[in-house]
Amino acid sequence: MDNDDRLLSEGKGMNENHEIKFRERVLSKSFLDRFYVDNTCSKRYHYTSPEGLMGIFKTRTFYFTDSQFLNDFREKININDELKLFWKENQKNYDIKFVNLIKNIRVTQYEDNSFSYIDNHNETMCRYFVLSLSMNEDSLTMWKYYSKNGEYNGYCIEVFDYALTDEWIDRVTGVTVIASKVEYCSDEKQEIILRSVDRLYKIWKSYEFSEMLDNKIIKEFTSWVSVEALFFKDECFQDEQETRYVAIVPTNKLNTLHYTYKEKEYKMYDFRIVNGVFTPFIRMPFNYWNEEVCLAISSIGIGPSANSEQKEAGLEQLIRSLDYKLDECKIYKSKIPVRY
């Protein structure tokens, strides 16, 4: 049963037009899912450079990049065009008072305090950090990012689904990690927005008028838009078949975030230089990363290459040199032919 259905069941048998008595305990419930999760994506592949792969092996962490510094820094506001289109096409289907509550909600920045999913970090300013993966284990589109002189010097890591578990929350630091596939098609995006707006409208229409309920609906939709924006991309990128892990981090915790390995603390928030830009990121350790056997990486692919045999031999040597074991990790070569 959905959250709104549970809420409405409290007034079962009553007229749905603002007749259900409003009680403040309603405000403690979540009206919307915080994000759209597509659990059909069972395998996720992270494409990276040789240097990136070595860093992952050595530190047992993945780098999550600040959403403001992704390749297309404007992508977080892609949802705004979809919201504008949605209201243009659907405004007539809702009471104007409801429309006026949420019609103008948009993503305007990369840092906000809308995310209230984390216990005790409600209303805390947060930033979003992204790890990009693909659902395609041998994608020419993705290999091209690592192309030089006809060689594709990239590697593709199959990430075990629970390596960076979705809906994972560190209640001490306030960090949460969520996962979902990226939506490219406008029709799909419109359907996702429609489901969320309809759910809110059903609740708003059923309960008696209350300013507190109105404010709750505004907050819920603002929160939902802020997170969902990270999973909407322009249709021109659809060949990437992207799926994402997103870490949501309280801004005031960034400089103190750390993890412990062999009794030594490691800072999670750091910077690297990408195309001349100081780019912030956080290191996210694998689940169970402190064990002698690593389950996080299921396979490693080698990009299209004329010397793939040598790359495979070097990769095998590197894996054997690690101070932990990769459990049944398979190495495979791209089937895409090399062209010069």
Per-region residue spans from a language model:
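Partner-binding and oligomerization surfaces adjacent to conserved cores of proteins
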Residues: 2-340
